[in-house]
């Protein structure tokens, strides 16, 4: 032992990690015995000091932090601001939840950090401070709950409760806080009990897998190894230090030409430092993966003993050590949650703060605007971003790492300690993520609207589930619905105002028809004439109510006369249109067939190219029976069917197609089909012949006579009855036995005598085989259908629609609804449509409009003189261009506009179903103007819809409008009603509610952007009027502060002395505005509540109250556009990723999933494609046999390494370090089984048998032939039940089954493992028992050698004796 004078004296606090290092160095220098003596002295000293101190804990020792009060008030203030932002629609529910969690978590963490300095300054000898911060008893989390704040709690499902406990246990809890605390404490107790048992069971299974693995040899002679690259910068030093130290080299290591380490040399600290200093080549080491022994491991493949620092001894039970090394930390780490009582734990992002005041500068081209997880605007940098902060002559540079958020703008002035960036969490910390669904419930009863197009969720094709493609607001417009049994038509129109006092003239029902999901909800006002004294309604205190009839637009039935059958009924957004007719007979016929023609509008109002716009089901192509369709020609074109295409998501386009046959004829082969349950009692046999009305089951009778065919399909029985004649063919007939064929009309021989018979119709000959020698041909009747020519189809549709030739093309096409040879099964009492006549929408694909991807369909509703007309508008639109406001542009920051800027209209197409085009002078009738904006500067179109329901498109040439004479015609009030498209509802923005009248022949000047030049000068020549809902006419003065812009149908506000170049807030009718938005630029302007603008008058704006809900892309929307939602209904569902709690109890299930080989994450869609690409490349480089061999080898090795890394990530995230050797032994066992395939190994093993991988390779080498097997990844439970010892299997699980199978198979247990020897009371083959076994085997071998030697001596002696005798 060294002299005391040579020892150094250290006076510092020592932790657990430092004690481990000290003990390791003591063992190296002094050995095991003297080290234990030193540690005993340390232990005795510790107990002596603890006894002398005699610390006791009282309630007065719990000192609360002085700064707690203002910290809690600051957190509450931040949450109040967050709540307002959420109410304004600037932050959605998930962002609000995240920010709320981080606010309270940061406050709680600040308390935790302040505890130690507070105790150190105020009371350094406080018992709580001494015990907890020295590690003697308790930890910082428990003391934090005693003197800080209890904080956020978890509910029984593990989710965070949004209400934090602000009190600590010293102050006492309120009733609400106590209940929330009990939630978390109960969860903590249950989790502790359950997860401790889970960890124990995991340890048992791990030991079960590897209990037989013992060190039995010194060297297995393998030349394989795993390469470790010491120059890998992505791997931290601690990781590959642990990977290399204690291993054995599989190959020599050279530095230049000098060998610095040889094969089979173990790596110590000194050799490892040489590798680190010299930066050598990749190092090949031996691992348990590379050992060639089947049931045990050699010393060199295992490496150094973890306890003694030299090569492991023979007989060491390394398998049990490995199982306990992995399982025991899980058991211990569950104890971490014992006393924290379910307190929620999480992490926050690391922040970068400015060191001093200054102006910040960075390269704007390297960042991209985005939103943080809290909903704040920020910039995302993909690479290292260099940010400089300038303050006079001082320049400070900061490097922002990739994937971080920059929270400030370029050239912005920042203050000292201001947060300028948030850095992503460390790359090597393993955070568990789980997908969480967050439902947002409506807190207002009313009508749903959204301000962007939404997509149908593909898995819910016809439901009310939609998916948002981009960030937008969802609105709930306030309104109440009174469900009543009676429904009556109203004489009022949509959006009309009505006075309650006007209802007192008699009994009258005024209904609010709200159509959604084919249900009608309405508001009912009921007055009884007998109650004349009480002229008030107690339920409705508001004087003026607005009727909202949604998109169905019911009008008074007296107006429609006998054409009310043409009213559209919503049927998955398909709408009925009437025919063209000239006479009463044609009109009556059209009314009968009106239900057959439908216009199909998608939910979001968007058409793709070659979409079906309208279709007509002709009754002559209908059938009541099931059957098969056959085409006469096979010329197939594809046509897009909107019902069948899958919505395109970002980066994914997937379409399904229907067949459209360019055929004149097709065939239908009728048959009777029944699908019966498997247990049905069928009264007919297969291949039997039945007559009409023959009972098939108890409740079913046959409708036709013919041959019965039975077939079983997926637990059901399919019964078909084929009508026709049976024909027994001769040997020379040329009908194929394996197929059926159509035979055209022709003359055939009836019998061998030569008589002939002429077939008039087509027949279908089908070969029926009963047995191998019994067969016949069934001749079935065929129905021939001829498809009408295109010219005959045009009469069904309006000529105006087909004559549009500018950009849009409408084609009339027939297509067959089923494929060639497809069977059609009908439903009882319903007809099957075979051919559909459709109108296909297309547009020119030229260079100018190459970006056009969609057509936007909308309906324009106009009401003139009490008549409602609907016009269909199809506007070609370019793909969505997200508008991002410039960062330095102050406009738009105070006002939220609607989504009109997203659309780029290109020559919209208007069509109207009228008998003839009518022209009428503008001077005689006032007309309603609807302006169309074109991108073509030379031609601008005005569409003028006059009160006589005729329309006319005029053009502006060079920005001027010229007067033309038009011939007036007589008006027929019934024509517009019969020829209107009907009340068609569609999911669109709210239509403009006011009407604009234009009486002018003066010039209108328009600039290039479609705006009005010189607003005041332009409006002086406009003679326009405003009609409000009460039909009062206003004529605004030019000097007023409101102007009408007819090009956008918006309103401009400005003042008398304002500059013309000044930007004005714009109000659109139907526009949504958020709360606290100022729409008038003047002092003391009112701040409005959120809602939708309904009316704009001279001195007031009418706003319907509404609540906005912000939603992000991918959010699921529940409900249709315009649907009525009650308070508390699910509005949207957010799917977001949340970090799990920070203890091992959340990680253990992941470890168990890996070890039991259950899928953790979703499998990549392109996995099969990637594997195929890899195999192709390797085969191309190395050739076919070597390519597949190396691919298989690399797959096995890489899967093993990947499993080891997955398990290590879980434990390293908790600060637990387990040596890779232990995990490698476990993974070696669960990846060492192969499944024998049916090809090749029938001589040695049975197909489907599980054998060891090394055993299969040895069998292949001994047989000198290729062996086919498939490598399996078995879980630890299945591996324990597939060992060489049936005694070990029976003692683990399913004892009776294992022993029964072992007895039937005659299995032999060689008692090589520990467990089977313990069960039978034998000597365990480990430790000292292993030496006895080795001694016995040597003694047995010696006895065998001596016996053989004696035999040979006797034989020699006898032979010599016989030779002498001879």
Curated annotation (Swiss-Prot):
GO terms for cellular component: chloroplast; DNA-directed RNA polymerase complex; mitochondrion. Its main location: plastid. The keyword Chloroplast applies. It comes from the Eukaryota. Its EC number is 2.7.7.6. Pfam families: RNA_pol_Rpb1_4, RNA_pol_Rpb1_5. Keywords: Chloroplast, DNA-directed RNA polymerase, Metal-binding, Nucleotidyltransferase, Plastid, Transcription, Transferase, Zinc. This is DNA-directed RNA polymerase subunit beta''. It comes from Phaseolus vulgaris (Kidney bean).
């Amino acid at each position: 032992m060294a002299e005391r004078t040579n020892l150094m004296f250290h006076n510092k606090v020592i932790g657990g990690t430092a004690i481990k290092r000290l003990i390791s160095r003591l063992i190296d220098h002094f050995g095991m015995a003297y080290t234990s003596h030193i540690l005993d002295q340390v232990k005795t000293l510790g107990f002596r000091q603890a006894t002398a101190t005699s610390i006791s804990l009282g309630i007065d020792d719990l000192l609360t932090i002085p700064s707690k009060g203002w910290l809690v008030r600051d957190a509450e203030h931040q949450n109040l601001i967050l709540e307002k932002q959420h109410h304004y629609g600037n932050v959605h529910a998930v962002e609000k939840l995240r920010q709320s969690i981080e606010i309270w978590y940061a406050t709680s963490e600040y308390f935790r950090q302040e505890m130690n300095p507070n105790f150190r300054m105020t009371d350094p000898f406080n018992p709580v401070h001494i015990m907890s911060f020295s590690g003697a008893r308790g930890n910082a989390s428990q003391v934090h709950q005693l003197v800080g704040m209890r904080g956020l709690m978890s509910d029984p499902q593990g989710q965070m409760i949004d209400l934090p406990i602000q009190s600590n246990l010293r102050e006492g809890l309120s009733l609400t806080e106590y209940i929330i605390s009990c939630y978390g404490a109960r969860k903590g107790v249950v989790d502790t009990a359950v997860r401790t048992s889970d960890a124990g069971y995991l340890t048992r299974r791990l030991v079960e897998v590897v209990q037989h693995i013992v060190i039995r040899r010194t060297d297995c002679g393998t030349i394989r190894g795993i390469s470790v690259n010491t120059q890998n910068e992505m791997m931290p030093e601690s990781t590959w230090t642990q990977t290399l130290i204690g291993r054995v080299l599989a190959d020599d290591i050279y530095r230049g030409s000098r060998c610095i380490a040889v094969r089979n040399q173990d790596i110590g600290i000194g050799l490892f430092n040489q590798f680190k200093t010299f930066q050598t080549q990749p190092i090949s080491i031996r691992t348990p993966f590379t050992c060639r022994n089947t049931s045990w491991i050699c010393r060199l493949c295992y490496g150094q003993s973890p306890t003694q620092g030299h090569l492991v001894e023979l007989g060491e039970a390394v398998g049990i050590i490995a199982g306990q090394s992995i399982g025991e930390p899980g058991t211990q780490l569950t104890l971490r949650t014992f006393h924290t009582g379910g307190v929620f734990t999480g992490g926050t992002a690391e922040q970068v703060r400015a060191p001093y005041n200054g102006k910040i500068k960075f390269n704007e081209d390297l960042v991209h605007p985005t939103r943080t997880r809290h909903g704040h605007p920020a910039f995302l940098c993909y690479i290292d971003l260099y940010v400089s902060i300038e303050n006079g002559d001082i320049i400070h540079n900061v490097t922002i790492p990739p994937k971080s958020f920059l929270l400030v703008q370029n050239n912005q002035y920042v203050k000292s300690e201001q947060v300028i960036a948030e850095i992503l969490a460390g790359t090597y910390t393993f955070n568990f993520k789980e997908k969480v669904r967050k439902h947002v419930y409506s807190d207002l009863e009313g009508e749903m609207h959204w301000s962007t197009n939404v997509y149908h969720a593909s898995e819910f094709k016809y439901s009310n589930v939609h998916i948002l493609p981009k960030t937008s607001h969802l609105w709930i417009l306030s309104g109440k619905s009174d469900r009543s049994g009676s429904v009556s038509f109203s004489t009022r129109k949509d959006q009309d105002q009505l006075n309650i006092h006007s209802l007192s003239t008699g009994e009258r029902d005024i209904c609010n028809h709200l159509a959604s999901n084919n249900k009608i909800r309405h508001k009912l006002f009921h007055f009884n004439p007998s109650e004349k004294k009480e002229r008030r309604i107690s339920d409705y205190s508001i004087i003026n109510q607005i009727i909202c009839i949604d998109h169905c637009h019911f009008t008074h039935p007296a107006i429609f006369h006998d054409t009310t059958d043409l009213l559209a009924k919503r049927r998955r957004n398909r709408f009925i249109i009437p025919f063209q007719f000239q006479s009463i007979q044609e009109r009556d016929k059209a009314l009968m067939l009106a239900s057959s023609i439908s216009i199909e509008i998608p939910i979001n109002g968007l058409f793709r190219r070659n979409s079906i716009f309208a279709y007509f089901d002709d009754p002559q192509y209908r059938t009541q029976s099931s059957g098969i369709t056959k085409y006469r020609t096979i010329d197939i074109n594809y046509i897009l069917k909107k019902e069948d295409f899958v919505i395109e998501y970002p980066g994914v386009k997937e379409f399904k197609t229907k067949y459209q046959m360019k055929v004149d004829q097709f065939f239908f082969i009728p048959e009777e089909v029944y699908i019966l349950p498997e247990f049905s009692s069928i009264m007919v046999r297969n291949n039997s012949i039945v007559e009409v009305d023959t009972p098939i089951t108890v409740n079913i009778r046959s409708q036709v006579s013919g041959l019965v065919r039975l077939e079983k399909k997926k637990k059901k029985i399919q019964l078909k009855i084929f009508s026709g004649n049976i024909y027994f063919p001769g040997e020379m007939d040329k009908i194929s036995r394996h197929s059926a064929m159509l035979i055209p009309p022709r003359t055939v021989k009836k019998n061998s005598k030569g008589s002939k018979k002429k077939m008039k119709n087509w027949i279908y000959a089908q070969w029926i085989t009963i047995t191998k020698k019994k067969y016949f041909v069934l001749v079935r009747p065929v129905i021939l259908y001829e498809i009408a020519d295109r010219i005959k189809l045009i009469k069904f549709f309006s000529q105006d629609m087909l004559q549009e030739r500018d950009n849009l093309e409408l084609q009339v096409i027939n297509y067959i609804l089923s494929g060639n040879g497809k069977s059609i099964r009908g439903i009882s009492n319903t007809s099957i449509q075979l051919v559909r006549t459709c109108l296909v929408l297309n547009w020119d694909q030229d260079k100018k409009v190459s970006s056009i991807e969609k057509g936007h369909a909308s309906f324009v509703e106009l009401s003139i003189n009490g008549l409602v007309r609907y016009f269909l508008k199809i506007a070609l639109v370019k793909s969505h261009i997200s508008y991002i406001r410039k960062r330095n542009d102050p406009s738009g920051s105070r006002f939220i506009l609607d989504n009109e800027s997203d659309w780029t209209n290109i020559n919209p197409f208007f069509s109207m179903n009228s008998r003839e085009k009518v022209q009428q002078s503008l001077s005689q009738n006032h007309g309603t103007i609807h302006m169309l904006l074109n991108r073509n500067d030379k031609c601008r179109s005005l569409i003028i819809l006059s009160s006589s329901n005729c329309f006319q498109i005029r053009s502006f040439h060079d920005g001027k409008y010229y007067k033309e004479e038009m011939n007036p015609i007589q008006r027929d009030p019934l024509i517009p009603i019969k020829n209107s498209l009907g009340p068609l509802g569609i999911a669109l923005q709210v239509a403009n509610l006011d009407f604009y009248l234009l009486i002018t022949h003066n010039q209108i000047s328009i600039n290039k952007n479609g705006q009005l030049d010189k607003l005041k000068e332009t409006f002086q020549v406009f003679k326009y009027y405003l009609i409000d809902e009460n039909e009062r006419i206003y004529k605004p003065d030019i000097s007023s502060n409101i102007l009408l812009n007819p090009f956008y149908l918006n309103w401009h506000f400005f003042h008398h002395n304002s500059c013309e170049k000044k930007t004005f807030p714009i109000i659109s009718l139907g526009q949504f505005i958020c709360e606290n938005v100022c729409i008038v630029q003047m002092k003391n302007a009112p701040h409005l509540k959120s809602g939708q603008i309904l009316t704009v008058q001279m001195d007031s704006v009418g706003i319907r109250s509404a609540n906005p809900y912000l939603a992000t892309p991918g959010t699921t929307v529940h409900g249709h556009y315009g649907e009525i939602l009650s308070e508390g209904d699910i509005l949207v569902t957010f799917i977001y990723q949340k970090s799990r709690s920070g203890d091992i109890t959340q990680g253990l299930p992941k470890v168990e999933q890996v070890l039991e080989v259950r899928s953790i994450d979703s499998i990549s869609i392109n996995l099969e494609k990637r594997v195929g690409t890899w195999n192709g490349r390797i085969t191309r480089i190395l050739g076919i046999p070597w390519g597949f061999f190396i691919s298989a080898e690399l797959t096995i090795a890489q899967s093993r390494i990947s499993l080891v890394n997955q398990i290590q990530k879980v434990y390293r995230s908790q600060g637990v370090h387990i040596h890779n050797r232990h995990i490698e032994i476990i993974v070696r066992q669960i990846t060492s089984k192969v499944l024998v395939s049916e090809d090749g190994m029938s001589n040695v093993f049975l197909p489907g048998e599980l054998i060891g991988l090394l055993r299969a390779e040895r069998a292949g080498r001994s047989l000198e032939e290729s062996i086919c097997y498939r490598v399996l990844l078995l879980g630890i439970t299945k591996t324990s039940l597939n060992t060489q010892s049936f005694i070990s299997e029976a003692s683990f699980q399913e004892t009776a089954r294992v022993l029964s199978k072992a007895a039937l198979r005659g299995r032999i247990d060689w008692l090589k493992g520990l467990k089977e020897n313990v069960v039978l009371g034998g000597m365990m083959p480990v430790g000292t028992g292993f030496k006895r076994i080795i001694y016995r085997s040597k003694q047995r071998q010696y006895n065998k050698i001596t016996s053989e030697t004696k035999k040979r001596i006797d034989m020699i002696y006898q032979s010599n004796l016989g030779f002498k005798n001879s």
